[in-house]
A protein has these predicted regions:
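Acidic/glycine-rich phosphate/pyrophosphate-binding loops and surrounding catalytic core
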Residues: 2-118
Length: 118
């Protein structure tokens, strides 16, 4: 795997923040707040659906961090990694409401950027 130089967080964070604002609007994630118990915890992996090259992991991590800095996010396959279906890319652990609130934005970045990288 060729080493990939990441963009500085200073450049990526405003884009991720704007995506979260667009996704959540003024009211926030009211569906998650209504359906997922506040005390529920989550621990799981984001896995590759198709073979390809991973990109956007830092943007995804920032999305989780902006929603809830207490989330434990581990990048298992850094940008530039070639993955097969079912291979874990990230592991996320923490309050379920926070994970569900950030996941759509995080997945959008990884899906779109990995598609381009592949």
């Amino acid at each position: 795997m060729r080493e990939i130089t990441s963009l500085p967080t200073l450049l990526v964070e405003p884009i991720v923040r704007a995506a979260l604002v667009e996704d959540l609007g003024r009211a926030g994630d009211i569906t998650t707040a209504a359906v997922v118990p506040k005390e529920a915890r989550f621990s799981g992996a984001m896995v590759a659906r198709r073979p390809g090259t991973i990109a956007g992991t830092e943007a995804a991590r920032i999305a989780f961090d902006l929603v809830d800095p207490t989330l434990d996010v581990s990048i298992l396959q850094p940008d530039g990694s070639v993955v097969e279906p079912g291979q874990p890319v990230m592991h996320i652990k923490g309050p379920a409401q926070s994970v569900v609130t950030a996941e759509r934005t995080a997945l959008n970045f990884i899906s779109h950027l990995s598609g381009i990288a592949t």
